[in-house]
Amino acid sequence: MAARFLTLDEVAEELAVTKTQVYAMVRDGELPAIKIGKKGHWRVERAKLEEYIEAKYAE
């Protein structure tokens, strides 16, 4: 079973973009993400990533 949450590195790999580009999408509110832990590691829920991809196809 696939993990529910993805790191920004994993999202970047899925989208074939850089981690910096993914961080910019998160920072700008384009891609929903949550911060985990004291250090604030970003995580993207797999379902939200799938919704993001589907929305991009619909544009």
Model regions: which residues?
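Major-groove DNA-recognition helix of helix-turn-helix-type DNA-binding domains
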Residues: 16-43
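A short, Lys/Arg-enriched interface patch at domain edges and termini
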Residues: 47-59
